[in-house]
């Protein structure tokens, strides 16, 4: 399961030969994608569309590869972050975890989490990347499985806009009622309410769900940004009800930030470096956060420290002090005296995620490392940014980054139930489903067109204007 840096030595290959192999495999992969994508959505009722000179043209073939990269990058980052999940949450209340991790802890022994009963992670004795090799299978987790369900529901119902009834039906069908069902805080409360007959968005109203400010929606809805490439306005419309299934107020705005980031990945100027793209996308997405919200103030606090070249560890420690110890800017989770001092809260985990996003500067490895070491619910930010960066560099970019091949199989039945083929899918199959969803979104929600001969989308461009959330 561990990344092996000795591949070139073991096989006695020169760097030039290795690069040539990667290049050849990339060409073969692209040819395969071109052959396979022509068969995607062949029964789609395509309306005649006359392209406009102002349309944004996006290749369906390239987007398929990017969606593959999303699922692969998300899995690598998710499982790596799981090693340190809830190892470090601070020293307030009954549960104290000592000093936070620093970059020096990478590669060193993992310490027990708050529920580890004194034992380190059973995933790895050390803090390091976790891989599913070619002949193995990635398992789903709560940072990937609800997104999988939403994609499935959009595809099954042949819609771009899920209803409360469709969300409730999907949750009840694919989530276990008892045993380990991999739901916590707001997700679990919303699920309980659905079992009682309640429909979203009522399942997140503060009067019904006391956990409305927890992390849940920001790990289950980012994918809607990819379903509306370069059009965050459409992405927010599609994601509104899924987000409001579990989140309100700051937790809702934070989730919308992530959705916008994912949509802007297809809008940003690709002539910029990936670092420049990430910084531009983050500043644009932050406009969604109301200026008087603690979410906005958290973003500004981390961004200011980053701009001042303050090391990420110091920024993380200052974030903890400012918001959990001193409860500044209206962040009053600590005074609520909830379990683990709100280690599942949307706010502190958002602040932590902005640290790994900005200081990672678009480098996949660095971003995952920082997210894994930053603390709290560490698998959530890593999964979110691993998915985003995996999308931006694609399958081949991920393989080149780690100089290895990965499994392309995914087992949704590790955490969810009642899917075909006993829950085993390939990333290519999952990406194809995404392409079919986007075909409908481009035509029905954007008023654009799909050209199956050229394998492109024509997306009407509008002025980018990110409004504050309400």
Where are these regions (language model features)?
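Catalytic phosphate/nucleotide-handling subdomain of diverse soluble enzymes
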Residues: 76, 80-82, 86-108, 247-250, ...
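Bacterial Sec-dependent N-terminal signal peptides
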Residues: 1-24
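Accessory "access/gating" subregions that flank catalytic or transport cores
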Residues: 43-45, 49-58, 190-212, 221-231, ...
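Mature, well-folded catalytic/scaffold domains that follow N-terminal targeting or propeptide regions
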Residues: 64-68, 194-205, 210-218, 227, ...
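Active-site-surrounding "flap" and adjacent substrate/cofactor-binding loops of secreted or lumenal enzymes
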Residues: 83-131, 144-146, 168, 178-181
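Acidic, carboxylate-rich catalytic segments that either coordinate divalent cations
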Residues: 22-25, 29-44, 300-339, 395-470
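Active-site cavity-forming subdomains of large catalytic enzyme subunits
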Residues: 133-134, 138-142, 146, 151-255
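N-terminal leader/propeptide and maturation segments of large enzyme subunits in energy/redox metabolism
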Residues: 124-140, 144, 150-179, 247-256, ...
